[in-house]
């Protein structure tokens, strides 16, 4: 049986083993999937040890995505653009030293938005909040959907400006700009995506009022039993639709499964089961 794992620190909270077990059962793929706690200074050793005992691939979570990027011997275009890796695929007998690094986070976000939520991004005005790793990982897949405009806003404006400039040249058909939260005053957006960690601190990004266009979607990469602080603030400010990041979690896992096994699982029943468990917790 082929072995896969998710590696991180901490890792006990991870839903990845449950998700991939459901995918394997649904598709009839014979595989095992486990969670591995790596020491903060022992990521590379942990990965290589897992590969040495027959591991075929790994998901990578906090805080090791940059180290995974450095460890990979080759990168997918979306991983190169993200500057971080959340999925590793190990080479077979002919290429034992090959480690492919991929980043499925942004693709998972886009699939959740466009397929699960029925929210097309083409021609829309998109606002991405944050300029860290989560935001960077989402940018290329978002831009590939050809929105009319994509604005990056961050507490430190210079980081948003720099991130926007790094992607603007490759996407001349999209109006890309970056700045601070206060620069959003008087502007309106069709899709607002929170890629900041503010919800972890039980806070919402300090956004000016009135940024949501009629029927706009507010999307938080974080998730919980109820509204996150960002979604609660969006509801109060008139967002037409609200969504959290549980679907993104399932869809990025499906992208990893597709990379490893060559088959895309049906995510709808897995997402519904996770949502029910979360509500009952």
Swiss-Prot record:
InterPro entries given in the database record: Aminoacid_DH-like_N_sf, NAD(P)-bd_dom_sf, SDH_C, Shikimate_DH, Shikimate_DH-bd_N, Shikimate_DH_fam, Shikm_DH/Glu-tRNA_Rdtase
GO cellular component terms given for this protein: cytosol
Binding site for NADP(+): 130-134, 154-159, 221, 245
Pathway linked to the protein: Metabolic intermediate biosynthesis; chorismate biosynthesis; chorismate from D-erythrose 4-phosphate and phosphoenolpyruvate: step 4/7
Keywords recorded for this protein, A-Z: Amino-acid biosynthesis, Aromatic amino acid biosynthesis, NADP, Oxidoreductase
Reactions accelerated catalytically: shikimate + NADP(+) = 3-dehydroshikimate + NADPH + H(+)
Gene Ontology molecular function: any one: shikimate 3-dehydrogenase (NADP+) activity
UniProt record, GO biological process: amino acid biosynthetic process; aromatic amino acid family biosynthetic process; chorismate biosynthetic process; shikimate metabolic process
EC code: 1.1.1.25
The keyword NADP is assigned to this record: yes
Source species, domain of life: Bacteria
Keyword Ligase found: no
EC class: oxidoreductase
Active site annotation, chain numbering: 65 (proton acceptor)
Binding-site residues, shikimate: 14-16, 61, 86, 105, 223
Function noted in UniProt: Involved in the biosynthesis of the chorismate, which leads to the biosynthesis of aromatic amino acids. Catalyzes the reversible NADPH linked reduction of 3-dehydroshikimate (DHSA) to yield shikimate (SA).
Family named by the database record: Belongs to the shikimate dehydrogenase family.
Alphabetized PANTHER family for the sequence: BIFUNCTIONAL 3-DEHYDROQUINATE DEHYDRATASE_SHIKIMATE DEHYDROGENASE, CHLOROPLASTIC (PTHR21089:SF1), SHIKIMATE DEHYDROGENASE (PTHR21089)
Assembly description: Homodimer.
Protein name: Shikimate dehydrogenase (NADP(+))
Organism listed in the record: Azoarcus sp. (strain BH72)
